[in-house]
Amino acid sequence: MSKRRKLPARQPACLETFSPDVLNDVSELFAKSFSYRKPLDNEWQLPAPTESFSCGHLEFRALLDLKNSLNEVKNLLSDKKLDEWHRHTAFTNKAGKIISHVKKAVNAELCTQAWCKFQEILCSFPLIPQEAFQSGRLNSLHLCEAPGAFIASLNHYLKSHRFPCEWSWVANSLNPYHEANDNLRMITDDRLMANTLHCWYFGPDNTGDIMTLKYLTGLQDFLSGMSPIHLVTADGSFDCQGNPGEQEALVSSLHYCEAVTALITLGDGGSFVLKMFTLFEHCSVNLMYLLNCSFDQVHVFKPATSKAGNSEVYVVCLRYKGREAVQPLLSRMVLNFGTEMTRKALFPHHVIPKSFLERHEECCTFFHRYQLETISENIRLFESMGTGEQERLNNLRDCAVQYFMQKFQLKPLSRNHWLVKKSNIGCSMNTKWFGQRNKYFKTYNERKMMETLSWKDKVAKGYFNSWAEEHTVYHPGQNSLLEGTASSLEYQSWQVLEGKKLPKVKCSPFCDGEILKTLNEAIEKSLGEALSVDAKVSSKQQYRCCPVFSEESVLSELLRLTKCLPDEQGAEPSGPVKCLLVGSPAVCDLQMPAPLEIQLVESVELTAFSCSLLHDGDPAYQHLFLDCLLHSLRRLHRGDVMVLPILSCFTRFMAGLTFVLHGCFRFITFSCPTSLEPLRTCAVLLCIGYQNLPDAVFQFLQNVHDLLSKLLHPSAPRQILQFLPMEALLQGTLLDFLWDLNAAIAKRHLHLIIQGERDQAIGSLEL
């Protein structure tokens, strides 16, 4: 049988092969730029500081008319099936082939839409000040930067053009590892971040939220050794799908905080790139006037690789006049930092010159026309697209690729010039997370419909049945075996990190985000019923649908694993093996054959701890767990085994303690569920083959315990968030183990809560 010959990759056509009308359309795609030409009489000046925040917002009629006309066209999309609409606009996007081509053609690191957009900005404007080239040093700050595409794009630009300067950068983003941050507001892709964490600043509370004054103050300290800052970028936004017509107003406070941060940190002559949306609102007019008074040049630019139908634009500000020029106003702006700034207008109407308003209206009209044309054209093609139009679109997309490459003269970059040459670590968000996040609710419409349903409706419609079904056939722990070595405990780099006390655990790098979100909803909406699930579901029913590992079966598994563990001479252990069993006195009556010698470490509180929205983030639980662990470690000798109950392992703190166990035992696995009671501790860690814990590590954990004791008071505003470097928790097999452990625990809780809800519903119907 002959092998099928692989066809050569299709080579993009030269620009000369495209028709004049196609070339004209594509060149227009790359010409969406507007410049604020300033009057020669220097009329555009900042008003007296006393004028700022002196009155409420009052919209401009002409701009409001533009906003309303745009929203009228957007409203025509409300009856479209959004997943179909997204597929359609992906095809009609004239720049749709550029990203994949660039990735292959120039070997771009983290090549995303943002990478290409920033490359366009870099190649279209002199963002890097001459002072950076003269000094041989470039310093940049990147706000709301995750996953890091602007940084990767800038690296490619500098390295491929061989610019003669040493580059240092600092980045910010909502911290994807902070348990109180909401997944909906974050970019959870950490491919670059996990490998460059020393360059990311998440603030004194470790959340990464730039909309607090504490963050701004902390950032200034963090940047103190990196002066001057030549370039600041701010690419912030958040999900406005629930109210797309008000996107501009919803993100205005974020844009304000980004702009203030830039004006405070940027050096004289520096550049600032700010992502905004439509510029119709009073708050946007004020911000644009502020930027025009603070920089020599301001341009509004829509990259070709920014989807033409959306409102996104980039405000490119060149040659900063310096803090001295804006200092009096800046001081007042800092006092209004955060979400509160939306209450009062930065400037009243009368201080903004008519010449600026006219120019600004021109700008808004310019981009309004392009966006309106694109949406209208997409609607027309959605209703009917013939073969000829499809061919023309394909021609336009091919032409756009060539136009992009020719206009910006991108050059290849070898991998050894990438920021992350070889990724050794990566959060589960990038391995299991991305494979699972859309597994259960595939279409946008389904996800939006889920938001409108009550918890009871979701249960009744069987939305979570797949998890329950997986749980009943799943045998957790059997294939999750962690093999450890003491050499992994490189405690010299360990450091306690404190932060704002967690109100609840909303996200975790060690668990499927959709499962955690659903479990939280179940606890929140169904807590009263959930606590009495055992009264509604008989033990026989629970055992049939959800097998429980008894103490005997857990110890039998422990014995089996112990026999697999060779002693120092390579044979099975011949003498008795001490088994430290942490838990309730009820297990004292268990009769186990040799070689296990059971010793009880009594801790009723640990086994009876109830699950809440804090999960294992509750400082009281963490203190109790660490106390039991330290007490147990004092009694262990080489070769001993231990059974340790665990509530869950969603937090960095508990993941750190699991990492320690991983380092001082030959093997670790788990059993779940081990309890019939809902929302109680239902899993145990089986730790086999103790290998001695270094005294320095034990002392470190003792110090953590002592600090925990001091922070245990309910009124304490802070808690310990982590004590191991995040890099240590993001590598090896630990991530997979924690993912499996947390999935088993969460699905068990969900299963019993859902079972209780169903039985209650059936009982109500019978009545």
From Swiss-Prot:
UniProt keyword annotations, A-Z:
Cytoplasm, Methyltransferase, mRNA capping, mRNA processing, Nucleus, S-adenosyl-L-methionine, Transferase
Which residues does S-adenosyl-L-methionine bind? G148, W167, D235
Q: Which GO terms describe its biological process?
A: 7-methylguanosine mRNA capping; methylation
Q: What class of enzyme is it?
A: transferase
Q: Where is this protein found?
A: Nucleus; Cytoplasm
Give GO MF terms, alphabetically.
mRNA (nucleoside-2'-O-)-methyltransferase activity
Q: Where is the Adrift-type SAM-dependent 2'-O-MTase domain?
A: 109-322
Q: Where is the active site?
A: K117, D235, K275
Entry's transmembrane regions:
none
Q: Which reaction does it catalyse?
A: a 5'-end (N(7)-methyl 5'-triphosphoguanosine)-(2'-O-methyl-ribonucleoside)-(ribonucleotide) in mRNA + S-adenosyl-L-methionine = a 5'-end (N(7)-methyl 5'-triphosphoguanosine)-(2'-O-methyl-ribonucleoside)-(2'-O-methyl-ribonucleotide) in mRNA + S-adenosyl-L-homocysteine + H(+)
Q: What does the entry list under GO cellular component? A: cytoplasm; nucleus
> What is the E.C. number?
2.1.1.296
Q: Which domain of life is it from?
A: Eukaryota
Purpose = S-adenosyl-L-methionine-dependent methyltransferase that mediates mRNA cap2 2'-O-ribose methylation to the 5'-cap structure of mRNAs. Methylates the ribose of the second nucleotide of a m(7)GpppG-capped mRNA and small nuclear RNA (snRNA) (cap0) to produce m(7)GpppRmpNm (cap2). Recognizes a guanosine cap on RNA independently of its N(7) methylation status. Display cap2 methylation on both cap0 and cap1. Displays a preference for cap1 RNAs.
Return the protein name: Cap-specific mRNA (nucleoside-2'-O-)-methyltransferase 2
Tell me the organism: Mus musculus (Mouse)
